[in-house]
Amino acid sequence: MMKFLKQVGDYTKEAIQAGKYIGQGLSVTFDHMRRRPITVQYPYEKLILSERFRGRIHFEFDKCIACEVCVRVCPINLPVVDWEFNKETKKKKLNHYSIDFGVCIFCGNCVEYCPTNCLSMTEEYELSTYDRHELNYDNVALGRLPYKVTNDPMVTPLREFAYLPKGAIDPHDLPAGSRRAGLRPEEIVEQSQQ
């Protein structure tokens, strides 16, 4: 009889322990059920990108002086600049400019070092095609004005990180009552006015 009671007691302890483990696992599940969804319903919802987003390159043909700085600073020598020397004006005349976005790494060096600012990064990132040769943009395709996500009536623009659960990106701030190193811009202005 004692052996039977001991077995029942052991079984009860194991059942309680198993219930604890199941409860711990389900607590994680229920915790995630209370959070907001993390995914974005992509074709119908798009994130508003930051100003410094490096998307498709926009090219202004009239500003380009065919100096080929963009080719020299590109890590893979990607932009193709075709020009001819005009003997009358003694200047280069740009004939053709192209960038293959299938190869481009979107580093932004060409935009940064361009002396005439004829290149700029846009917020376009939807460059998918069925044929990789369609990713080779010539000066006409590069000159096409970029679109903005916020101007598309079929898309719900979402603020950056607004879709994340609350507390997911809370700043790691200083303890209450302590000061940051240095001065804030407002404090510098106040000091200069005094």
UniProtKB/Swiss-Prot annotation:
Protein name per Swiss-Prot or TrEMBL: NAD(P)H-quinone oxidoreductase subunit I
Catalytic activity: a plastoquinone + NADH + (n+1) H(+)(in) = a plastoquinol + NAD(+) + n H(+)(out); a plastoquinone + NADPH + (n+1) H(+)(in) = a plastoquinol + NADP(+) + n H(+)(out)
Lineage of source species: Bacteria, Bacillati, Cyanobacteriota, Cyanophyceae, Leptolyngbyales
Locations listed in the record: Cellular thylakoid membrane
Provenance organism: Leptolyngbya boryana
Residue segments, region Disordered: 173-194
InterPro entries attached to this UniProt entry: 4Fe4S_Fe-S-bd, 4Fe4S_Fe_S_CS, NADH_quinone_OxRdtase_chainI, NDHI
MF GO annotations: 4 iron, 4 sulfur cluster binding; iron ion binding; NADH dehydrogenase (ubiquinone) activity; quinone binding
Keywords associated with the record: 4Fe-4S, Iron, Iron-sulfur, Membrane, Metal-binding, NAD, NADP, Plastoquinone, Quinone, Repeat, Thylakoid, Translocase
GO biological process: photosynthesis, light reaction
Binding-site list for [4Fe-4S] cluster 2: C74, C104, C107, C110
